[in-house]
């Protein structure tokens, strides 16, 4: 890996100089001066997905400098290292091989002198057989009833990803009721337990380490609830399953060895939905659809690995993101899926991006003096239009946005979808081109308002535009297309981290909070005043404990 701070490259200097020249150019002018702009700045993926990046504040020259940056930092070598199984997660001495989980060609991937595809395929076969038994009613609970409810207990990547996908692919859902429990707040589990019957429910305990406090706490409470009804320890074998890399801890919990679906330390938690952590997805949509989901991701993997810099979708989107965060000074990026089934898509990539690239130390162990990962947020359209779009249109911040929509809806109720898509097109147009003073003035005059009213209202109606967007149009949200879309964003995150010279696959910041919370939890059980914390934490703890007397 090239451990170069990107602001020490010639490409960075070129971009810095170039930025001074174009920073005030409006998108209106960029489109007016180039009638081929859309054609040049858009890519179609497999005739299923259109990526339009023409409404970005870039020129041909910008793109040349950005692509030079990718070449100078040698992104292609980084891609090859990841796909080969090199230990690019240096701080944990691990490979990063979620791509192996969707390697549909079965190309051998050698790790520690072993072809890991043999284990991957064996796991997939085990998941297939189990899911078919559950879906077809052949797997029975402790009283002989078929399974109707599936409860996935996990947090972070073991929850956000599977939950997002099962929601996005709800049109492909079978009869099983899917529930997801993540929060250590007892309310989350309690409300799910109210809805289910222990006789026809299975619990999937999804934790790579099988030590995550939230997950294991919820799992123990679910187990206690189940045993209260079954009164039979052996009944756990019909109802509790572990999705984990830690076989020993799963066995100690009471999981039958045959009920453990393993995954490996080379699968990062936030990329684990492709692994056994995605068992709930397979149970929801069936094995055949899960295979198509993997196929779509594999197709994007091939595009990412083989396509040149200039036409490589994840590379281009990553470069454009870096352009905004490090030159325009934008702090956030928004993701707006115009599809209600995809209502958790933004939240999933909030975690994937911010946990991956929320770093301030470079790969040489030195503090960074440039911006790394942006804040990711978003909601489905059109809800967001009536919540926070106002700030994007007329606020003081630059907020690059991704708009995602299907051409065909799964629920084309009357003309609902055409209205939805009309909003999609209108918002990207309005954000790019805005509404100038002259055009508003002309319309106000035509409306025959008096001069005083025009003068009073005119400044407030101006929308400056020049807000950048990417538009991703997908033929339909299918398992294949969703798989490709997720892989696209995953690879974008990798490229961003690689160029920014950070390690994208650890999360040491998360670990600190875990350690401190355990210390405080132990202390809360002691009925003495705290003397070892800062004044604020001590005050909070003492106020809490005053109610426990």
Swiss-Prot record:
SUPFAM superfamilies hit by this protein: SIS domain
InterPro entries: G6P_Isomerase (IPR001672), G6P_Isomerase_C (IPR023096), Phosphoglucose_isomerase_CS (IPR018189), SIS_dom_sf (IPR046348), SIS_PGI_1 (IPR035476), SIS_PGI_2 (IPR035482)
Pathway entry: Carbohydrate biosynthesis; gluconeogenesis; Carbohydrate degradation; glycolysis; D-glyceraldehyde 3-phosphate and glycerone phosphate from D-glucose: step 2/4
GO CC field: cytosol
Keywords tagged on the record: Cytoplasm, Gluconeogenesis, Glycolysis, Isomerase
Localization of this protein: Cytoplasm
Short name of one Pfam family: PGI
Active site: 355 (proton donor), 386, 514
Gene3D superfamilies noted in UniProt: 1.10.1390.10, Glucose-6-phosphate isomerase like protein, domain 1
E.C. designation(s): 5.3.1.9
GO molecular function, one term: carbohydrate derivative binding
CDD domains xrefs: SIS_PGI_1, SIS_PGI_2
PANTHER family (alphabetical): GLUCOSE-6-PHOSPHATE ISOMERASE
Function: Catalyzes the reversible isomerization of glucose-6-phosphate to fructose-6-phosphate.
Family stated for the protein in its record: Belongs to the GPI family.
Listed name of the protein: Glucose-6-phosphate isomerase
Gene that encodes the chain: pgi
